[in-house]
Each structure stands twice: as structure tokens, then as C-alpha cells.
UniProtKB/Swiss-Prot annotation:
Protein name: Probable manganese-dependent inorganic pyrophosphatase
Entry's family note: Belongs to the PPase class C family.
Compartment annotation: Cytoplasm
Keywords, comma-separated and alphabetical: Cytoplasm, Hydrolase, Manganese, Metal-binding
Protein EC: 3.6.1.1
Source organism phylogeny: Bacteria, Bacillati, Bacillota, Bacilli, Bacillales
HAMAP family found in the cross-reference section: PPase_C (MF_00207)
Cofactor(s) demanded: Mn(2+)
GO CC, alphabetical: cytoplasm
Pfam families: DHH, DHHA2
Source organism (scientific name): Bacillus anthracis
Length: 309
């Protein structure tokens, strides 16, 4: 049986990794030869979850057409966020919870996108719909994905469906969602030992906003100053990325997991759009974004609207 690769976006977060594992397992149970893979490094937060539930991380691939003809995308759909050679393979399915942009296919496909906080929430439904029992370890990873994407249920993207799914999965996994979740988020917020290049690419996504090319990277911290003390070095590596990719804006967002506020570091010729979008003034290229924790709901649509205004 021909193999199908299942993967999330480049610079994968916990949902991208864990949902690839969970969906590949469901597809295998349903008779498909599916393998989860990843398009980037595993973050400290994700590694904590993998270690906790004793699951091996997916192998890394840069290209997919050299291995398979067919792929399944989870937690993304935009071409620039996917495998470098995504145009050379057939996308069989997409399971996602983001905006749909820069995506088209030559054939009809199974496309499931729901306005929930996490791909794993959708997968929880799909396991039930197919009558497949979720293994304890996989339930733990799916729970981890929901906790990560919802910032332990505090993000505005978090829905009642996400909370209900997390409670169900926590029971299967045999953990206390709140206690485990805080441990996992703290592990992810430990940025010691990371280079500046790693910091700005840990969870970075590229977007087309009108005619502008924008990259938004986000890291969680217990104290934003722990990251911003390195601002000069960060600006140097961000400026290099802006030049290399021809970006109009690179927004580096440091989110405080305790206060649920963020600080944005804006570099690029369109940095003023951040001021316009949030009605703030950049001082030394930074501004506090009160109550902003979600890239998907509080940053991407707000900046997109500002660019198009």
C-alpha cells in the first residue's frame, strides 16, 4: 500500500506535531499506510509532551515528493507554510482551524476546517465519528496540543468545544489538565540555551497580507524581559531575515503566560502598520500589546485589515 505523509506547518508548534501523530494513527487504524513527519525542529514545549507521554517525535523532512505522491496537511493550509515542494504532490486531505489562504487543488479533497482553538479538538471528534478508541499516549499529546494553542484555556481562540475535548482527553491520558498544562507551558517558556536564530524561528509563520509579505514569530515567557534583554541581537538576526526573504514586516511577539499580555518587536519598512493596527506607538521598535496572546485571532486578522485599509 502506498505511503501517505501527514504533517503540520514549518516551524511546528505542539499542535502541528501532535496532531500529525494523532491523525496518522487514526488513518492507520482505518487502513491507510500513513506516517507522521515534521517540517522543522521540535520545541521545548512539544518535547516535554512527547517525553511525558513516552512517544517518539516524527522524523524531519525538508521535501516530500521524493518519498510520496500523496500527503495530508494538519494545522495549516497556506502553501508558504507547508513543505517546500508541496506543489509537486497531491494533497488528499486538510484538517485545520486557521484562515484559508493561498491554497487550491486540481481535484476535490476532504477538507475539514472548523472555528475552534486547536486541530486536536477536531481530531477528537473524528476519532469518535469513526468509532476508534484513542490510546492513552495519543490522548495525552492531543491534550497537550489544546493546552498549547489555548494557552491553558485563556486564549480568545479557545471555545467550549476545546475545553470539553481537553477534559475528555485528560481523563483518557490520566492527568490533571490544569496541573499538567502549567508544567508544559513553563517548559515551553524556558528559553535558556536558545540562540537568537532559534528564538525567532521556534514558532514563526509567513503570511501574505494584501501586497505585503509578513512573518510573525511568537514565543511564550514567564517574564518578557528575559527575552527582550537580548533585543539588540534579536534585531540583528530579524533584520537579516527581513532582507533575505524580502519581508515588509517581521513581528516578533513575546507573550507573558502569567499576565496574558505581549510585547511586539516590529522590524521592516511596514513596522508602522503595527502602530496603526493596535493604536500604539513603537518605542525602540517595541510596543506592549495588552491582552494579546493569539496570533490567529488577535494578530493576523488585525494586521491584515490594517494593511488593506
Amino acid at each position: 500500500m502506498e505511503k501517505v505523509l501527514v504533517f503540520g506547518h514549518k516551524n511546528p508548534d505542539t499542535d502541528a506535531i501532535c496532531s500529525a501523530i494523532a491523525y496518522a494513527e487514526l488513518k492507520k487504524e482505518l487502513g491507510m499506510n500513513a506516517e507522521p513527519v515534521r517540517l522543522g525542529e521540535i520545541s521545548g514545549e512539544t518535547q516535554f509532551a512527547l517525553d511525558y507521554f513516552k512517544v517518539e517525535g516524527p522524523r524531519f523532512v525538508e521535501t516530500v515528493a521524493n518519498e510520496v505522491d500523496n500527503v495530508i496537511l494538519v494545522d495549516h493550509n497556506e502553501r508558504q507554510q507547508s513543505a517546500n515542494d508541496i506543489e509537486s504532490v497531491r494533497v488528499l486531505e486538510v484538517i485545520d482551524h486557521h484562515r484559508i489562504a493561498n491554497f487550491e487543488t486540481s481535484d476535490p479533497i476532504y477538507y475539514r476546517c472548523e472555528p475552534v482553538g486547536c486541530t486536536a479538538t477536531i481530531l477528537n471528534k473524528m476519532y469518535k465519528e469513526n468509532g476508534v478508541t484513542i490510546r492513552k499516549e495519543v490522548a495525552g499529546l492531543m491534550l497537550s496540543a489544546i493546552i498549547s494553542d489555548s494557552l491553558l484555556f485563556k486564549s480568545p481562540t479557545c471555545t467550549e468545544q476545546d475545553v470539553a475535548a481537553a477534559r475528555e482527553l485528560a481523563e483518557i491520558a490520566g492527568v490533571d489538565a490544569d496541573k499538567y498544562g502549567l508544567e508544559m507551558l513553563k517548559a515551553g517558556a524556558d528559553l535558556s540555551g536558545k540562540t537568537m536564530e532559534q528564538l525567532i524561528s521556534l514558532d514563526a509563520k509567513e503570511f501574505q497580507m494584501g501586497n505585503a509579505k509578513v512573518e510573525i514569530a511568537q514565543v511564550n515567557a514567564v517574564d518578557t524581559n528575559d527575552v527582550l534583554v537580548h533585543q539588540a541581537e534579536l534585531e540583528k538576526v530579524i533584520s537579516a531575515v527581513v532582507e533575505e526573504k524580502g519581508l515588509d514586516l517581521f513581528l516578533f511577539v513575546v507573550t507573558d503566560i502569567l499576565t496574558n499580555d505581549s510585547v511586539g518587536l516590529a522590524i521592516g519598512k511596514a513596522a508602522n502598520i503595527v502602530e496603526k493596527a493596535y493604536n500604539v506607538s513603537l518605542e525602540n521598535n517595541t510596543a506592549t500589546l495588552k491582552g494579546v496572546v493569539s496570533r490567529k485571532k488577535q494578530i493576523v486578522p488585525v494586521l491584515t485589515e490594517a494593511f488593506q485599509a
